[in-house]
Amino acid sequence: MFWTRYAGASILLFFMLIRLGQLYPRNDMNNFGCEECKLKENNIFSKPGAPVYQCMGCCFSRAYPTPLRSKKTMLVPKNITSEATCCVAKEVKRVLVNDVKLVNHTDCHCSTCYYHKS
């Protein structure tokens, strides 16, 4: 008799948890608070009739334990390996705004993070 109640309560709890999970929106919580990689107007350098755009937004990054065979080949062994892609300009156009040479981004994509390279 006890096991029947226990099994029934477990099944009821399971279905309640499934229902609760369905109430939340199905968006990617990894990028919460960070928009996708796209062009946005730069308010500092833009002038009326001459907007200046730059790439802004998030791409992916992850970290994981370094495999032992990779660790053996490193000059300075590290326990954690990380990978990342950054929001960078795919195409650019050089412009002159108030005698300042600027690079106006015309297209964006997620690619290698150059500032991480050393």
Swiss-Prot record:
Disulfide bonds join 34-58, 37-87, 55-108, 59-110, 86-113. Glycans are attached at residues 79, 104. It comes from the Eukaryota. GO terms for cellular component: extracellular space; follicle-stimulating hormone complex. The keyword Signal applies. GO terms for molecular function: follicle-stimulating hormone activity; protein heterodimerization activity. Keywords: Disulfide bond, Glycoprotein, Hormone, Secreted, Signal. One of its GO terms (biological process) is positive regulation of steroid biosynthetic process. InterPro entries: Cystine-knot_cytokine, Glyco_hormone. Coiled coil: none annotated. It is found in: Secreted. PROSITE patterns: GLYCO_HORMONE_ALPHA_1, GLYCO_HORMONE_ALPHA_2, GLYCO_HORMONE_ALPHA_3. The keyword Secreted applies. Gene3D superfamilies: Cystine-knot cytokines (2.10.90.10). Involved in gametogenesis and steroidogenesis. PANTHER family: GLYCOPROTEIN HORMONE ALPHA CHAIN, GLYCOPROTEIN HORMONES ALPHA CHAIN. Belongs to the glycoprotein hormones subunit alpha family. Heterodimer of an alpha and a beta chain. This is Glycoprotein hormones alpha chain 1. It comes from Cyprinus carpio (Common carp).
